[in-house]
Amino acid sequence: LQGSGDAFQHVLAIAPLLLHLNHPQLPGYVIHAPSGIANFLASDYQKKWLTNEYSIHYADHKPSTLKSAVNFHEVLPPILGVYVMGSFGSISQTSSSDLDTWICVRDGLSPDEYTLLTQKAKRISEWAMQFNVEINFYLMDQQRFRNEHYADPLTIENSGSAQYMLLLDEFYRSAVRLAGKPLLWLHLWVENEKDYEKEVARLITEGEIDPNDWVDFGGLGQFSANEYFGASLWHLYKGIDSPYKSVLKILLLEAYSKEYPNTCLIARTFKRDLLAGNTNPDHHFDPYIAILAKVTQYLTALSEFKRLDFVHRCFYVNAKEDFARYQANNWRIRYMEILAQEWGWSAETVKHLNKRPFWKIKAVKENHDNIMKFLMLSYRNLVEFARKHHIHSSVVPQDINILSRKLYTAFEELPGKVSLLNTQISHNLSEAHLTFVEVRGNKHFKDGWYLINQPIHHIMFSKERVIEYGESLNKLVSWAYFNHLLTEKTELSIFSKNVTLSTLQRFVTNLRQSFPSTIAKQPKNSDLLNQCEIRSLFIAINLTTDPTSKIEEVLTGISSRDLFSFGSLEQSLVGSIDFTYRNVWNEIRTLHFEGQNAILLALKVLSNKIYRGVNRPDSIQVYCYSERYRQDLRQLVMGLVNRCVSIQVGDIQQPCQTSRLRVAGNNWQLFFEDRGIS
């Protein structure tokens, strides 16, 4: 616990007490909720806290002053043990680490009791958040778990049905008992884990052990290729949002799968050393140091040293998160310094990684690309593992669909899709200056838009200065905005023959009005199982091509429909249309249409993006950047877009199935059908 704050240690000390007692004055109280932990002995700290904060005097086993108010079970306590697992106490624990805590309940709790205890645990979690400590409680029935019925719904914090034995391996290698009975598995060695249940039964029959003295989730002999597949998918899912924490576990599963079916589990190694009296092994009984050693051995055998170096960097960055809070003699700092020397890192490498929270865009992009390459390679290796073992996954199908869709939205590169950089890499990517440069007909650069993070008068345009490229201005601005380079304080410049600075500034303002720069929440599982409906849509008319700027005489008294076939030349005054939209999978996508038929192409594509019978987008914003006829064009396009959307989502129950438009001198008949406009 060295380096953890007072609040963290306070929550860790008091949480078991609050599970043991159920008193109206105490945090976590729920009327009639089961309470009481087997073999519970209150510490001096806990007793003092009760006395000082609530004037309650606690006496072990017989809390006489609480008897009338506490639902206290002396004979059959509902809680057999409380264990914290994961990074707790390891080199990877930081101030932001949560406390994943298993509450092992006795067999036979009624559904109502289970519900009340769940509510009590939730209230204790809420109490802990007052100290900025996140503690997650999981009620675990050992018999239910042993029968592989641990299949709660998949969430960002819960693997659902994706892993069972692997979760138990992690629990056994990292669990620390806070209160209650000890774990039988840690005290009983068998040569083959498949024989564990038989050995336990034999010892019970011969009277050598009393099962009531222990908590037992069973042995580790039921691994399957299917479970490796499901668990690896889930950790890849976690790795998208929390790469530094997940990289090591992803590689551990890959190393385990290579050894399958004769996997050498870390939990088994720990138990062997404990029972052999080896109190000072290389892993120091630190689960994360042991994982690092296992992964290092695996990658070294494959001669994948670049991949190993990336793992080292992720491990260092994750462990380094809180080093500024530690004293110089902290064991975590000393150990990481030893590792950096063993890895042969230069002082410059260490300095660069220490500055990771303050990296700017080029370093962040490089790191983000490395993370994506790593995850993609792990995904390909996982697919190969599935083929090798002919996996027809027994993971709940809904889980697999959710996991696959999450990976799909993160990995797939599509034209117009805005790549969102991982927000954990750096604390602040904002730029003081951004310049957008349009290039056409240059033999050294492909046509499109280039972004430079310097003011225009400092630019010597070169590939080395470019931080991002986009085929359209819309996509490039969206990339800068949603990745937080472009803020309200950013000074903008533009180098273009077609777009003025004032137009760019108005476009950025409208984009900011239409979308928050930060996506506040993860998509719901139900959303990931459905089609990628458009949630918010922003449409820009004539952003990069404005035919009205070349009109010498403004005509009056014309029909709005004439704007698509204007004057004697019958020219469409819509030269370009840009879409920016966020879908229910929380992807940001852009589309660009240009030319005399831009309006037709845009409507056709939009009708295919709005699926029949889905919800109407939460918002549709239309802006026009024309020099002339700005309001007329905006109203005309907005009307067509709203009609198209209304027909597709079913707001118009009996729509006119056709619509006639004259565009650039040609008459077009639009047919609204199930598959969109044709």
For the regions a protein language model found, what residue spans apply to each?
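Nucleotidyltransferase catalytic cores
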Residues: 1-56, 147-155, 172-678
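Extended, Lys/Arg-enriched charged tracts that mediate electrostatic binding to polyanionic substrates
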Residues: 41-78
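Short linear interaction motifs
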Residues: 60-67, 76-85, 291-299
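Catalytic micro-motifs at enzyme active sites that drive phosphoryl/nucleotidyl and oxygen chemistry
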Residues: 68-73, 81-93, 124-127
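Catalytic metal-binding acidic patch
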Residues: 83, 90-116, 134-138
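E2/UBC-UEV (E2-variant) core
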Residues: 116, 120-134
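Short, conserved secondary-structure transition motifs
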Residues: 133-155
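Acidic, Ser/Thr-rich peripheral helices and adjacent loops at domain boundaries
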Residues: 155-164
